[in-house]
Amino acid sequence: MFLYNLTLQRATGISFAIHGNFSGTKQQEIVVSRGKILELLRPDPNTGKVHTLLTVEVFGVIRSLMAFRLTGGTKDYIVVGSDSGRIVILEYQPSKNMFEKIHQETFGKSGCRRIVPGQFLAVDPKGRAVMISAIEKQKLVYILNRDAAARLTISSPLEAHKANTLVYHVVGVDVGFENPMFACLEMDYEEADNDPTGEAAANTQQTLTFYELDLGLNHVVRKYSEPLEEHGNFLITVPGGSDGPSGVLICSENYITYKNFGDQPDIRCPIPRRRNDLDDPERGMIFVCSATHKTKSMFFFLAQTEQGDIFKITLETDEDMVTEIRLKYFDTVPVAAAMCVLKTGFLFVASEFGNHYLYQIAHLGDDDEEPEFSSAMPLEEGDTFFFQPRPLKNLVLVDELDSLSPILFCQIADLANEDTPQLYVACGRGPRSSLRVLRHGLEVSEMAVSELPGNPNAVWTVRRHIEDEFDAYIIVSFVNATLVLSIGETVEEVTDSGFLGTTPTLSCSLLGDDALVQVYPDGIRHIRADKRVNEWKTPGKKTIVKCAVNQRQVVIALTGGELVYFEMDPSGQLNEYTERKEMSADVVCMSLANVPPGEQRSRFLAVGLVDNTVRIISLDPSDCLQPLSMQALPAQPESLCIVEMGGTEKQDELGERGSIGFLYLNIGLQNGVLLRTVLDPVTGDLSDTRTRYLGSRPVKLFRVRMQGQEAVLAMSSRSWLSYSYQSRFHLTPLSYETLEFASGFASEQCPEGIVAISTNTLRILALEKLGAVFNQVAFPLQYTPRKFVIHPESNNLIIIETDHNAYTEATKAQRKQQMAEEMVEAAGEDERELAAEMAAAFLNENLPESIFGAPKAGNGQWASVIRVMNPIQGNTLDLVQLEQNEAAFSVAVCRFSNTGEDWYVLVGVAKDLILNPRSVAGGFVYTYKLVNNGEKLEFLHKTPVEEVPAAIAPFQGRVLIGVGKLLRVYDLGKKKLLRKCENKHIANYISGIQTIGHRVIVSDVQESFIWVRYKRNENQLIIFADDTYPRWVTTASLLDYDTVAGADKFGNICVVRLPPNTNDEVDEDPTGNKALWDRGLLNGASQKAEVIMNYHVGETVLSLQKTTLIPGGSESLVYTTLSGGIGILVPFTSHEDHDFFQHVEMHLRSEHPPLCGRDHLSFRSYYFPVKNVIDGDLCEQFNSMEPNKQKNVSEELDRTPPEVSKKLEDIRTRYAF
């Protein structure tokens, strides 16, 4: 079995975010890392929408990311620390839209190791040096400079190693143009290591150490070190030189401290806490991330606590000495992994879990009544300030980036009866959790819908003048009339536009600079800017059946297949070409391309005929109306559309932006198929045809503009958009009802919209999330969803949600009541009334936990619910709250053989589980009966068990439960479940159970899979095979009777299969002593499974399912990852395909090595050597290679570049999208 890996949706969780001017213009951009992906985002300063400019897979783990700018430069570079053992400096090239590797210096081994640098990066604020550090011991400093040609150069590394030292954080200190300096949070563990009593370990202190790079001596010295009172978790650089006092802020538990050299005394200020917080009062508070904003006149920091509260931190200085730190509560946003304050006044928040946000900073919070806390205020040691959290006041949300991270569970099923299956994804954490329903398609925003007086058959938009940015008229054609609407604040009917209203319209367009043309069945109407009208009438009884128009040309087909060609002369007159062209059959459809910039005319006309052919006809004056080429079609054409697509933006000498792309002829057939063919711009030849089936209706094609490039809207029983995005073609359905006719639409409110008609309504639509594979509907949940099952009859979902360190609703209410009573009791006689009012206000206050976070209850505190949900409407039908410290871990829906048709839900619950050191007071299996057509849970009984029931699976009319490391068969009893049989020989802890026939495949938390056979006659569970590798299995899926696919905690996917000679018939041993099964092999079962395939995905996979994703497609193995990625593994159907892709992968490894310097083969073989899998993500980078490299690779494969990319597209569309 050979598989091909494809990513459908890249990881969405963000681990690092940096900002700067990466394209060299004044625009602010953000570079984010999503595990093994680098992405460049550009927030539009006018609309606030975030656009993705570039996404690159780096095939390595990005461990740190920094931006720097050389002194006097205008462009930021990116320095990346990864697991490749190399430091890499990247530059973004806007002309090619790619990251270019400028420098790659090797310094150590690959892999994420504790003493190989890469975990921490720090840059001197003036861009003169960069320090790259390991978690332990090693630190290297590289000096950055320019050569004579102003190119960036990098020195050889200077060492600043110190053995037995752990590093917690590193920053560059802003010292102006003095020798560059770096500050590190370190801890020396040498004494603690050598002291057997453990006393030294208890007294070990963290130190703040400054390293100075002496540029004169080219040497790094350890300048200064001092022990810290509290344990710091990160450092913030304070602007220095002429901008500020320099030094660092140390964020530690409960305090923030300012430190600098010389006579500067330490300034420390406690971190304020929420008033009346339900959190455990003993729990400390830390800052988790920060962002700095610096202008010429001032600077401030925004720092966020682990509850999500952002504080604005300012420093008061007196002659370069800091005198106090001031903190002011700013706003509360979800807890971030990284924050960036952009110069354009935006705050980008990359959330730890869930969606990411872009906020506009509306106020700086200087002049509001929020109290300001200062280090100068007198406080007892151990006391702190209190503030009241509130909804957003200084920030305004302007954009939200959908993120599925973390996906904890996923099932694929067509519960909504839509032909195409939906993905039901449980994601998020705590109160920000959600169940999301993903459908393949682009999200459509409806801008306006208006009723029309009848059912129109076509719609167009035209501009008044070629220089206009926006459209002026919408023209709607009916069976016997034409309606003209003007576009302004509102859309109104106009009568003086010059259009003929008493006839249907075939087409209309802007002609030349400022004239309009209307083609109707009896003639052509040319309307000048001063409302003069020229008409051309059809001869005799002939009428116009089809037409094609652009800015300078009009072609019409008369009845009988006669073509008449008009072209505009320099004076703005429409002139008919002297000859007419008779076609051999009736014309069904025609298309002209737009006139290329700087040219007089479009050279080609495409004509589709009844005889199932499409012909390209020249419009060049030298051979006008001469046929150039022809293509036979499998069915009759319905519509044609010539577009220029896939171009990269180029700037010419005058700075004019234009794009150089390829001409494509799109052909929509009457049988619902779309063909895309390359049209040669010189000869007019047609080549390289791609085919896609779109739906059951004939395909109509319309040209629209998306992100400044031409795109094609194709309408069949579903509407599809064909567009080029990041050097790849996308053909994506729109998640919207069926449309009949459309045209591009540009107005002030909606610069790149679509106007469309559907029955008797006119709709204005916008597509904002180009490049998105899925559109999603999210239903909020209360705690982190762990697993869910689908009830087969009602299609409802039964979800278990569990959170550690959390209170149940009942405990929360109880704690609040208790705190309110304490408030009243603590008050003196005269303050009683005031205290009572405060207590009442506190009880009534209800801040949404999805924004403000849930209170942290402490270790060993659990909260759980069981929810029954309708997945289509997303409404909760039933909710069962479990008691405090009961944690639901497993769920199953099953029927018992002795109870007939009733469905039961079993939920495995742990009681008082403490994770570290692990202890558990036992567990229960709750049994519920599904009543009321699967909408309500009726509690039957709970069965006590001695360990955590982490896996439940129905089995032959009974149920299998993994209780800790015991595998048991239970049956339903009146008062509880009855134990029928057990096996005690599983190694550690059962994390999953799959069943097929008499076989049970058990996943162990550390020891991979164990195959068990149930013998009915002797009522025994007997282990007959296991795996030879230890695998920390997270999820498994059965592929057939002998084969199982599994994933582990470290990001690997494997497929293991029992060899054909495996014997599970224990009864057949004639001697009766069952010797084979008792013998054992390699400390395990007597028979071993074989590994069919191994592959390192690079993200922890938490669900696997064998399914088909598109109607009529083939089966594939779909996986989802913790970081929000969705991918598939698809089998090759032929040897030659496998051979071809193996060679593509081999050539790309050498011709197009990964961006961060990691070896592709060793990345995919991180834990186990990669076996029988070809990496489609690498193969698809073929499309983004430079054309000459593409040519070299395809010549090695005896193909042309279009043939190679066609193969890549075909394998993708056969299984997915």
From Swiss-Prot:
Residues of the site described as Interaction with SF3B5: G284, E306, E352, R429, N916
Residues annotated with Phosphothreonine modification: T1200
What keywords tag this UniProt record?
A: mRNA processing, mRNA splicing, Nucleus, Phosphoprotein, Spliceosome
Q: What is its main location?
A: nucleus
InterPro entries (alphabetical): Beta-prop_RSE1/DDB1/CPSF1_1st, Cleavage/polyA-sp_fac_asu_C, RSE1/DDB1/CFT1/CPSF1, WD40/YVTN_repeat-like_dom_sf, WD40_repeat_dom_sf
* Location of region: Interaction with PHF5A, SF3B1 and SF3B5: 105-119, 145-168
Instruction: Keyword check for Nucleus, yes or no.
Output: yes
Provide the residue span(s) of the region labelled Interaction with SF3B1.
1028-1049
**UniProt function note:** Component of the 17S U2 SnRNP complex of the spliceosome, a large ribonucleoprotein complex that removes introns from transcribed pre-mRNAs. The 17S U2 SnRNP complex (1) directly participates in early spliceosome assembly and (2) mediates recognition of the intron branch site during pre-mRNA splicing by promoting the selection of the pre-mRNA branch-site adenosine, the nucleophile for the first step of splicing.
What does the record's free text say on domains? The core of the protein consists of three beta-propeller domains.
Q: What is this protein called?
A: Splicing factor 3B subunit 3
Instruction: Provide the species name.
Output: Homo sapiens (Human)
The uppermost taxa in this organism's lineage are: Eukaryota, Metazoa, Chordata, Craniata, Vertebrata
Give the gene name.
Answer: SF3B3
